[in-house]
Amino acid sequence: MINPAKRTSTIELSQIRKMFEVTNPTAINLGIGEPDFDVPENIKLAMEQSIKNNETHYTPNKGYIELREAITQKFKKDNNINTNPENIIVTAGASEALYMCAQAFIDKNDEVILPDPSFLSYEACIKLADGKVVGVNCEMENEFKLKASDVQEKINKNTKAIILNSPSNPTGAVMDKEDIKAIADLSIDHDFLIISDEIYEKIIYDKKHYSPAAYSDNVITINGFSKTYAMTGLRIGYLNAKEEYLEELLKIHQYNIACANSTAQRGAYEALTGPQDTVNKMVNEFKKRRDLIVSRLNEMGYKTVNAQGAFYVFPKIENPEKFVKKSAENGVITVPGAAFGQNGKNHVRMSYANSYENIVKAMDILEKGVN
């Protein structure tokens, strides 16, 4: 037998995906992080027209210039980030952008600071680059928000980067402006990289989103179209970085996939430049669902923070593994919080990217059959 590379032994296949493969397909799925809405019609039409125009060949490595220009305008308008199309790479989803960052900048034993809990792909990407994860606890008492003062305590001569994710998967936490700016200042003072995953930027309720790249140029900003425009299967995202970073990132991108999907790029352009009413409707619906699930869980005695963004809640639950197992047996899929870090071990992640009616049914099942 041919032995696999040692680096793959440091990670495992996603426990979330494994669980979905063995659960009852008729169960109510509160586990998956995917909008239950369809791609808006104007985006579908743009992609259909692209195929009719035979735009099915390679695009420039960085992506179509029209799309990169639209992304540049989006950064200026929404994020107060002044950039240009040459500093943008269109990627195969935000996931590729994250992997590119790790491969381009993380060396053996470099330390990367991560919020704990955080999206499980972050740790995997760091380990595949032979880096070392340094966790910073995000406490429930502070609504799971990452604090700059806690980050500062973890910085040393080996610190290479920090990954930020606001709004957060799995907690729905939205970082305060003061902490975003303070961490940006720390990146300048201590010369480390900020990788800012802003994929949930538009799915935000009672707060405002802030980008660290508005305060420091030691930042690679990652975003995409999967969550905001329900384009998960089309695998289209992007990143922005200063010129000296971009050349290294482009090496990984160029030899990995050459370019992002041409048809999806045309859809992405329409997403940014077309009407945004479907996004607003989706976010309003998510807010209603959040209010429902938070209220029901708290009524059941499961302490739950009122998430400010994304579409997840992270209730505190005694014996989460037993809860997840019993929930699945009764027809509701949830995810153990330990999948997202040591600090998530007393929690369960639930996604409200499911219909209002299904969430009501799921809460009734949990109340009767699990609680």
Report the location of each language-model feature.
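Short, Lys/Arg-rich amphipathic segments at extreme N-termini
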Residues: K6-N24
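Conserved donor sugar-nucleotide recognition element shared by glycan-biosynthetic enzymes
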Residues: E12-I16, Y64, A94-S95, F144
